[in-house]
């Protein structure tokens, strides 16, 4: 669901709010992110999050919103410091936590396709299980040793493409600008 402020402001005053929302509602999050100045996620008749599209995407406030958006995965991790956590398959992940967690906390880390960077020279290699062309980029689905499936974007101008069953390097250290955990 999205809200375009200009669209609402420009509607004739004689129309009711329900009429405006009929024209301004979508179930496609890509469309909502593109068109909306504000996005609201309504699940089970309850408003779960309402904010600008950037914040809804990058800072979802619940696992329900993460699952609804379906733009990343939650992986198990352990908080090891003020700006670090560990995942069994990926190793150390650095960044800025959006909420504080005590050292030693077990959390679910949100990994979005743009969070990991490809690096052919890296010693962290994951198996390619799928590759989809998306115009400006490819989205690779990579399998970890513990069978997690992780989506990763790679610019479509990348020198070479990786095929299914090939190994795919992930740049280390892993640094995520904003670490979202639950």
Spans of features found by a protein language model:
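Short, solvent-exposed secondary-structure boundary motifs
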Residues: 1-3, 64-70, 119, 131
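Single conserved hydrophobic/aromatic residue that forms the stacking wall/gate
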Residues: 1-21
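A generic local structural motif
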Residues: 5-9, 27, 94-96, 156
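Internal alpha/beta loop-helix hairpins
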Residues: 22-91
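Non-catalytic connector elements of ABC transporters
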Residues: 72, 82-182
């Amino acid at each position: 669901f999205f809200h375009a402020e200009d669209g609402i402001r420009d509607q004739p005053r004689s129309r009711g709010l329900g009429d405006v929302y009929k024209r301004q509602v979508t179930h496609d999050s890509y469309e909502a992110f593109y068109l909306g100045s504000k996005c609201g996620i309504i699940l089970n008749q309850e408003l779960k999050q309402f904010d600008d599209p950037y914040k809804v995407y990058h800072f979802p406030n619940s696992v329900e919103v993460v699952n609804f958006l379906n733009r990343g995965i939650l992986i198990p991790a352990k908080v090891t410091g003020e700006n670090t956590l560990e995942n069994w398959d990926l190793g150390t992940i650095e960044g800025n936590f959006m909420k504080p967690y005590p050292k030693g906390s077990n959390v679910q880390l949100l990994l979005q396709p743009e969070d990991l960077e490809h690096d052919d020279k890296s010693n962290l290699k994951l198996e390619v299980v799928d590759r989809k062309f998306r115009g400006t980029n490819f989205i690779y689905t990579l399998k970890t040793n513990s069978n997690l499936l992780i989506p990763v974007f790679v610019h479509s101008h990348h020198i070479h493409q990786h095929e299914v069953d090939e190994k795919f390097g992930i740049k280390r250290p892993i640094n995520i600008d904003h670490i979202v955990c639950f």
